[in-house]
């Protein structure tokens, strides 16, 4: 299983135009770590899917005009740290389960979008966006959720 994870992460660490990367992870409480690495360049796509408790994801897209970054986490204890510097790009984060947290940053962009959806107790989101004509949507359903959003 360790070799499979390393191969999946290695396949996504390099970057360039019109590249797509996917890091699926399954397993309960195994402490999986999805390193999306730096998938940069225009028209890039980065997807991380995690199923099981104890997972974490770190994703960065820089100089990624017209690009998409998607993280989906199901299970307790998940966390995500996401960054994107781009125009006309999007971040879509979905977390289902207990104890999830997310930090999202989008900078130097215009016409960009961030969507955060959290379902379950104890979720938290911190969102910062430095972008013109851009949008942030945060949806939280459950107990003890909190959100902080800044747009500059």
From Swiss-Prot:
The keyword Kinase does not apply. It comes from Escherichia coli O157:H7. It is found in: Fimbrium. Belongs to the CsgA/CsgB family. Residues 1-20 form the signal peptide. Curlin is the structural subunit of the curli. Curli are coiled surface structures that assemble preferentially at growth temperatures below 37 degrees Celsius. Curli can bind to fibronectin. The keyword Transport does not apply. InterPro entries: Curlin_rpt (IPR009742). The gene is csgA. Its main location: other. Keywords: Fimbrium, Signal. Transmembrane segments: none annotated. GO terms for cellular component: pilus. This is Major curlin subunit.
């Amino acid at each position: 299983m360790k070799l499979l994870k390393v191969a999946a992460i290695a396949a996504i660490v390099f970057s360039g135009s019109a590249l797509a990367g996917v890091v699926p992870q399954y397993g309960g409480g195994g402490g999986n770590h999805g390193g999306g690495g730096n998938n940069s360049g225009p028209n890039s796509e980065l997807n991380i899917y995690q199923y099981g408790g104890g997972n974490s994801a770190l994703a960065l897209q820089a100089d990624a005009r017209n690009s998409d970054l998607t993280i989906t986490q199901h299970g307790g204890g998940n966390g995500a740290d996401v960054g994107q510097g781009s125009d006309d790009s999007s971040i879509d984060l979905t977390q289902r389960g207990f104890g999830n947290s997310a930090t999202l940053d989008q900078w130097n962009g215009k016409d960009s979008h961030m969507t955060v959806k959290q379902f379950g107790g104890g979720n938290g989101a911190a969102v910062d966006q430095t972008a013109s004509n851009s949008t942030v949507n945060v949806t939280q359903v459950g107990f003890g959720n909190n959100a902080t959003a800044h747009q500059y």
